[in-house]
Amino acid sequence: LATEDESYSTFLEDTFDTICEHFPDYGYSPFMNEKFYKDWSHDLNWGIHQARCVVGHNLKVAWNLTRMHSLKPKESYKVFAHQIADAIPGSGCDNQRGGWYDMMERTLKDGEENHRLVWHDRKAWWQQEQGILAYYIMAGVYDDKPEYLKFAREGTAFYNGWFLDYEEGGIYFNVLAN
């Protein structure tokens, strides 16, 4: 985009239009779909993804949609970004200890009220980064939901409290609830 060559922004616009058209899957799950067959039908059997959600991928799409909305404002970008940002705290966040989970099952089984963790309660540093970026960027650009700033600040506090090694000067890449 720094080249000011219009073909790059047109390419991005086409990419984001495609994301808005095919990734939402709210009739099936609060999480977006990430894997597709050539005809855009959902691939719910691919690798580790299967019928699962990578929380950080959802959050990354939300903040990138917001950035694209700033470049080429479209209601579809704003709506989808908000759908993602509104779904994650209730479905992909550890509301007891803080932080965003790694992978979640995309659907509930009979009788369940909460989405299940795929393997464990791991929280990866990059997932926290995506959440912090998503909620700070959306709070700043849209300024329409005060809870976004709250989620950004809570995510930042969680990251600073659990991922930074204050004794050795390093970082932890993953943390678990225990």
Write out the residue ranges for each language-model feature.
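Glycan-recognition and catalytic cores of secretory/periplasmic carbohydrate-active enzymes
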Residues: 1-178
